[in-house]
Regions:
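N-terminal glycine/serine-rich phosphate-binding loop of ATP-dependent small-molecule kinases
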Residues: 1-105, 232, 257-269
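Gly/Ser/Thr-rich active-site cleft segment
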Residues: 11-13, 134-271
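Conserved ATP-utilizing enzyme core subdomain
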Residues: 17-19, 189-193, 211, 362-372
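Active-site phosphate-binding/coordination module
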Residues: 29, 75-155
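Short beta-alpha connecting loops at secondary-structure transitions
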Residues: 46-50, 111-118, 318-331
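Active-site nucleophile and cofactor-binding loops and adjacent substrate-binding regions
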Residues: 54-57, 81-88, 109-110, 118-121, ...
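ATP-dependent carbohydrate kinase catalytic cores
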Residues: 155, 209-325, 352-353, 359-364, ...
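A conserved active-site cap/scaffold subdomain adjacent to cofactor or substrate pockets
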Residues: 326, 332-343, 348-349
Length: 372
């Protein structure tokens, strides 16, 4: 049997990770981690305002770094790498221009947080979230029914509305909005137009209100009743969505040269990170998979014939095919999990850093503890 390798890439909250694996045996051949430098310095973030933004350049630098490292670890495997697939946090959208380029990659927007990717845990759009939830509840069709009758400030339309309301300049220059899990495959395949972009079912269904039962996204009348500023964005979203088992295309000549890989490498449609974690853990009907990290995402699946027309109140995402084809995927959990532990550690260590260490600065034990 010919050697066949694949690369999986996971964009998390603090870092991007890559794994080179043997497609036949699932053996891990090499891995790599790249921490986002701007994020590490908390640039463009304001915890007091619940504002958390990430610069697209961190994502691009990380992409080259992690793939470069896993390929360098086994250069003999490079000619046999057949596919690369990506999952990311969500909803992590960004305003883009006509070429699908994030506005923050243009010089005039390089330091504008609103032109960057709005990280999943950004809660600046709470007011917009409440408006959308209220509008859904009043409508003949409740377009929030698949997110537990509540549309979160962590979701796509809340964030987009907040950004566009806040800046006339952004309203002028933003041609469209792209989720991170759709943008990375677009970058790798050389996609430069929204009409050519393959939108992932997972993010569209769980974060962007896409559902087959109402023919895709909610109609223009819904968004006009919310705020007409959203209508141009709605009209430019790809109508069709694709599962992560579908190719988005092949590696572009530009990125093949950058990464030292073949232009024949298949790039998968992007996915949401916790949904990929559920698949990797072997999720099936009757099991629950817990993805524990910065947040805690609890995942389950159910055959649609057992669901019928019912929806579960309070469950964040209930989407056909979002985790496994032919199954309804469920996503619930806690937005703050690892973040709470990190806060608690900082709280406990405060006396070490602020009281004990200044009193005994040469104490190696105190210095080590305070540095953690």
């Amino acid at each position: 049997m010919k050697e066949t390798y694949v690369i999986g890439i996971d964009y998390g909250t603090d870092s991007v990770r890559a794994l080179l694996a043997d497609a036949a045996t699932s053996e891990t051949i090499a891995d790599s981690v790249f921490s986002y430098p701007r994020w590490g310095r908390q640039e463009y973030c304001s915890p007091a305002e619940a504002r958390f933004r990430q610069h697209p350049q961190d994502y691009l630098d990380g992409l080259r770094h992690v793939i470069g490292e896993v390929v360098a670890a086994r250069p003999d495997a490079a000619p046999h790498i057949r596919a690369v697939s990506v999952d990311t946090t969500a909803s992590t959208p960004c305003l883009v221009d006509r070429t699908c380029t994030p506005l923050a990659l243009r010089p005039e927007y390089a330091d504008d947080p609103d032109a960057m990717f709005v990280l999943w845990k950004d809660h600046t759009a709470q007011r917009e979230s409440e408006e959308i939830t209220a509008l859904c509840a009043r409508g003949e069709i409740n377009y929030a029914r698949r997110s537990g009758n509540h549309y979160s400030s962590e979701c796509f339309w809340s964030k987009v509305l907040h950004l566009l309301r806040g800046s006339e300049r952004l309203r002028r220059d933003a041609w469209a909005v792209v989720e991170l899990c759709d943008w990375i495959p677009a970058v790798l395949t050389g996609c430069r137009a929204m009409e050519d972009l393959r939108s992932g079912l997972c993010a569209a269904g769980s974060k962007v209100m896409w559902a087959e039962e109402w023919g895709g996204y909610p109609p223009e009348e819904f968004f006009a009743g919310l705020d007409p500023v959203l209508l141009p964005i709605l009209r430019r979203l790809p109508v069709r969505t694709y599962g992560c088992d579908t190719p988005a295309g092949t590696l572009s000549p530009e990125w093949a040269a950058k990464l030292g890989l073949s232009e024949q490498v298949v790039i998968g449609v992007g996915n949401v990170d916790c949904h990929s974690g559920a698949v990797g853990a072997g999720i099936c009907h009757g099991t629950v998979v817990l993805n524990l990290g910065t947040s805690a995402c609890y995942m389950a699946v159910m055959p649609p014939e057992k669901m019928g027309d019912r929806m579960v109140e309070g469950i964040f995402g209930q989407v056909d095919g979002s985790i496994l084809p032919g199954m309804v995927g469920f996503e619930a959990g806690m937005s703050a999990f690892g973040d709470v532990y990190a806060w608690f550690k900082r709280l406990l260590c405060w006396p070490l850093r602020e009281v004990l260490l200044p009193a005994d600065p040469e104490n190696e034990t105190l210095r080590a503890l305070a540095a953690q």
